[in-house]
Amino acid sequence: MIEVYTDGSCLGNPGTGGWAFLILNDGGITNHFGYQLDTTNNQMELTAAINALEFIKENDEITLFTDSVYVKNGITSWITNWKKNNWKNSQKKEVKNKDLWIKLDILNSQKKIIWKWVKAHDINDHNNRVDLLAREAAEKLIKSSFD
């Protein structure tokens, strides 16, 4: 079984954002992070999950931990109605971040994933680590733009 922790961060919303993931597999730990200009927190949360799932090549069962209720509920519940309603939400408006949701949905259908929500800024060391990495990625981008 593979465990994945993901997080996204945004300095301003919209603003400069960072994403990170951490993968625990066979006793090893891998983490990656990145950043983006002019983004939102939700886009970074989705990007973290997408990049983590794209990184994993094995067909093992994955437990993905996110502190984003938006990502967890979106992929496990809301997306069913969005697809039925041609990517419209309950207010009949276009689903925000549709392009990212489509990517995540494809990855979700290709892998065996258990989605779990974890409380942010709490006692989970792995979640705290990806939170820090995502924030640092966004902060580095801002710092580099002033150098």
Model regions and ranges:
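RNase H-like nuclease fold core
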Residues: M1-Q43, T47, E54-D60, L132, ...
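RNase H catalytic domain
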Residues: T6-T16, N51-R129, L133
